[in-house]
Amino acid sequence: MAKAPMRVAVTGAAGQIGYSLLFRIANGDMLGKDQPVILQLLDLPQAQQAVKGVVMELEDCAFPLLAGVVITDDPKVAFKDADVALLVGARPRSKGMERKDLLEANAQIFTVQGKALDEVASRNVKVLVVGNPANTNAYIAMKSAPNLPRENFTAMLRLDHNRALSQIAAKTGKPVSSIEKLFVWGNHSPTMYADYRYATVDGKSVKDLINDPVWNNDVFLPTVGKRGAAIIEARGLSSAASAANAAIDHVRDWVLGTNGKVVTMGIPSNGEYGIPADTMFGYPVTTANGKYEIVKGLEIDAYSQEKINITLNELEEEKAGVQHLLG
């Protein structure tokens, strides 16, 4: 028997990431090749015409799994009964804009969206915040939706995770698929800490294979942390297809499970590994039956603790910067 369609809300639907994302969702890449979807697309009033153009293209692909499309500039229409919500749209940083102003501009957007999700989304909605600053935007949305479970709100660290994977694959000369137990701690920003101390490639320790602390500090972490800036420098535009791909990976694994494989998700802390409760923090997780679980019992050495503290301090500062807007 055919499955009932799942409702997938996407904000910033007319944007670059949205354009890279929607066709893959409609093709079944995110929720499975047997799962029909209804896309509920949100964007600003001035972007409605552009969204209509994207929808024409979606129609022209004749995707068997696409059961319907809604276009709107009203969050309450976009999030109505949503099973999955991808919050992609965010205020980008414009020239001369202070980080504080960026935080405040986004706080307003994500407060409105959090409240709308709280009112109209499915009680089991899975929310992924892609729009930057992703961790803090996810924190704001979560705090604005007191009637939804906190664990329904997540931030995207999967792009950092995938970037780290590809760097390790290149360094070891091994395929990406052979690398396991690599993960990322903290904020989706250059302070994130990609940790390969427990990673294996074909069952062998990556740390032993590479055995190069200088490469770790001077090449690996800066390359992963500043990859977004390097792409803007090279392409003149921010990373869109890779961000969309990471969003699909994140939701697919959350919904369909990782079969014991460790991945990275930005999730609200319950105090694990000494991170203050409610902090939206990148953690190593496994997922099954639509739920994620933090990998327990990892030893945090002095070097790792120092790196985790740096990214945590940045997140605490961001959190403090928006607290007055949360009432």
Swiss-Prot record:
Catalytic activity: (S)-malate + NAD(+) = oxaloacetate + NADH + H(+)
Active-site residues per Swiss-Prot or TrEMBL entry: 188 (proton acceptor)
GO biological processes: malate metabolic process; tricarboxylic acid cycle
CDD domains (alphabetical): MDH_chloroplast-like
Signal sequence, start to end: none
InterPro entries: L-lactate/malate_DH, Lactate/malate_DH_C, Lactate/malate_DH_N, Lactate_DH/Glyco_Ohase_4_C, Malate_DH_type2, NAD(P)-bd_dom_sf
Pfam family membership, one: Ldh_1_C
Annotated NAD(+) binding sites: 12-18, 106, 113, 130-132
GO molecular function terms attached to this record: L-malate dehydrogenase (NAD+) activity
Domain of life: Bacteria
Binding site for substrate: 93, 99, 132, 163
Protein keywords: NAD, Oxidoreductase, Tricarboxylic acid cycle
Catalytic activity, EC: 1.1.1.37
Family (UniProt): Belongs to the LDH/MDH superfamily. MDH type 2 family.
Function comment: Catalyzes the reversible oxidation of malate to oxaloacetate.
Protein's name according to its UniProt entry: Malate dehydrogenase
Organism: Cupriavidus necator (strain ATCC 17699 / DSM 428 / KCTC 22496 / NCIMB 10442 / H16 / Stanier 337) (Ralstonia eutropha)
